[in-house]
Amino acid sequence: MTTSIENTQTTVTTSTAKTVITHNGLFHADETFGTAFLSLLLGSEVRVVRTRNPQVIEEACVALDVGGEYDNAKLRYDHHQREFTDVHEGTSVKLAACGLIWRHFGTCLITKLHPELDIEQVKTLWQSVDETICRPVDLQDNGQGTFKVEGAEAQALTVSMMVAAFNQQDIYSPAQDEAFMRVVEILKEYILNFLRSEANKLQLLKEAEEAVKAQLGSRVLVLDKFLPYREAVLKANAEEGGQFDLVTYPAQGQWNIQTIPVDDTPENFYSQRVSLPQRLWGLTGPDASKESLGGSALVFCHKTGFLAAVKADTAEAARKAAEAVIAEAQAKA
């Protein structure tokens, strides 16, 4: 099997890119993550060599965090040279090996692992990995991750510190190389799970956007499963003439009815366009079951009135329950 690394400047296949070089000795999060990214992209055919030998580095196809050269056309990704000043776009965070590899190969890795994503979703996921993983790792590697607490130097617990803990007493021993590859395997698993989770989230966001568009004229958004609807609903209400007041979705054999904030400003994060009837707030168990909304028995209502559950058999019954909430609010307005 031949796996391709592709970017705007060069294409390399595993038939010629079997060897990835990084430095030996003490290892850090930036080159372990970078090696993990490349290993996931190239697959089982990749061969990782840890060395500082200039001749070996010169003959390698891909070299990261070693060699004193950054040249994407030559697949050289070091950041230690004095003239290197590249930063993560829009920030002052200097790039290290993790960010450099992700900059050039992240999109290719995402499309390989998640071909179901469209171009915009790939861009969003790339940005998420860059912000969540690469920037903090590079920040730490370049010495920008230290902050002061009550006048003393302190560091947050970071993935960089986790990686550093694997270093052996003799950093040039075979055990050090074995430890490095253990970290790479751990990071590969983390990267796979992070990408899977974020890709799934993007798909759910897309489903939510489609549901909102399809029901734009309604005051009740009815979902056939829970979706991360908040962003899509607030955008529709603010920019697309939407008038959504409530959302309802199935949950564990019942239907939840949830309020929608006035807008997406921080001060209105917990606001409610329409609140559930105050007479229901905090009800649970037998007390709740004595009440109903639109013909569906109440299961519970949160004490702040932002969420309730009803025993509705169908989506239409849940809609009627939500519409009853709106009608009661209008009657008291």
Residue ranges and their predicted role:
Residues S4-T85:
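An N-terminal structural lobe/cap that precedes and organizes the functional/catalytic core
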Residues A17, V49, V122, K206, ...:
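Sparse, context-dependent recognition of short Cys/His-centered cofactor- or disulfide-binding micro-motifs
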Residues F33-L40, G99-T107, R135-N142, S160-A164, ...:
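Short, hydrophobic/amphipathic alpha-helical patches that form generic packing surfaces
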Residues L41-E45, G106-P115, Q168-Y172:
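Short helix-capping/linker segments at secondary-structure and domain boundaries
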Residues L64-G151:
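A basic- and aromatic-enriched beta-loop-alpha substructure that forms the phosphate/nucleotide-
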